[in-house]
Amino acid sequence: MKYDLIIIGSGSVGAAAGYYATRAGLKVLMTDAHMPPHQQGSHHGDTRLIRHAYGEGEKYVPLVLRAQTLWEELSTHNEDPIFVRSGVINLGPADSPFLANVAHSAQQWQLNVEQLDAAAIMARWPEIRVPDNYIGLFEMDSGFLRSELAIKTWVRLAEEAGCAQLFNCPVTALHHDNDGVTVETADGEYRAKKVLISAGTWVQALVPELPIQPVRKVFAWYQADGRYSMKNNFPAFTGELPNGDQYYGFPAENDALKIGKHNGGQLIHSPEERKPFAAVASDGSEAFPFLRTILPGIGCCLNGAACTYDNSPDEDFIIDTLPGHDNTLIVTGLSGHGFKFASVLGEIAADFAQGKSPAFDLTPFKLNRFTQ
């Protein structure tokens, strides 16, 4: 049997692609080295932010707005919502380039964003403390996603639609010829007209020339009472300290507030190097500078987890065909800010498999930007 599309890596983007391509009527095989959702990539830990006024650059805004529509559609397939509209407050110095990008994106795309000075931030959310020179940009239509529930839902819907699934089975090699692609796995060989490589952190095992640097990251839950919950209108947040360090976090659930540091981490070169939470001495205290400054009422660290970023050199996505092989799409380099886009990236991959032109300008995400 020859598939229309074989997906290598069925985490966030791959799971979405499997569903959307199967729904479009294609013969699809989803593969993964583990059983998605799993703990080996970047999608675990229950929740991920979704921001619309994008501080990483306005080139992402059309993608995230389409992603939002798809997330809301996906939520209709569950009793529990996948998207939670908590609002997101972006905090930082008034001269922060990140916040300038947020404001610019909001203006360009007429997004619902409110700017607050330091006094207004602390009046609305007394739990938050900020220096006098800080501002907040509040995205009231943004919030967070239940990441593992999303992947479970896509995998289930794809299977129900007739998608073949081969999990706990690593892909070991790809071979291109004039008639398509042969995908070698521990279970045997499979043939496809087109392939999506969405293998996350360890994509270089299949495509060694990709400029991807795996980074070990951690996030943790800290003791927090009901003041920090959505019942008290406490939002999700991003925060930049005066030294430039960037943090993100979520409203407390079950008396625990999740927070992580976006920058930093440990460079790694194999899965074995991604040690569990607390294996690095700084893991449990990484968020302390932010908590002491911005959220002084938060309590002790309860538990945490490690994940992996697949960083590109400029921390922008890579969405491109494999050089010399127009039948193989690569989605990688999501650099720790990709989950919110998983729905639209999966749709882009499904369009690719159908021979459709992308609905977005993907030029900023091409591989050739690293050689120009």
Swiss-Prot record:
PANTHER family: FAD DEPENDENT OXIDOREDUCTASE DOMAIN-CONTAINING PROTEIN, PEROXISOMAL SARCOSINE OXIDASE. FAD binds at residues 4-34. NCBIfam families: PRK11259.1. It comes from the Bacteria. Pfam families: DAO (PF01266). Its cofactor is FAD. Binds 1 FAD per subunit. Gene3D superfamilies: D-Amino Acid Oxidase, subunit A, domain 2, FAD/NAD(P)-binding domain. Disulfide bonds: none annotated. This is N-methyl-L-tryptophan oxidase. It catalyses: N(alpha)-methyl-L-tryptophan + O2 + H2O = L-tryptophan + formaldehyde + H2O2. One of its GO terms (molecular function) is N-methyl-L-amino-acid oxidase activity. HAMAP family: MTOX. Keywords: FAD, Flavoprotein, Oxidoreductase. Monomer. Its EC number is 1.5.3.-. Belongs to the MSOX/MTOX family. MTOX subfamily. The gene is solA. SUPFAM superfamilies: FAD-linked reductases, C-terminal domain (SSF54373), FAD/NAD(P)-binding domain (SSF51905). Catalyzes the oxidative demethylation of N-methyl-L-tryptophan. The modification S-8alpha-FAD cysteine is found at C307. GO terms for cellular component: cytosol.
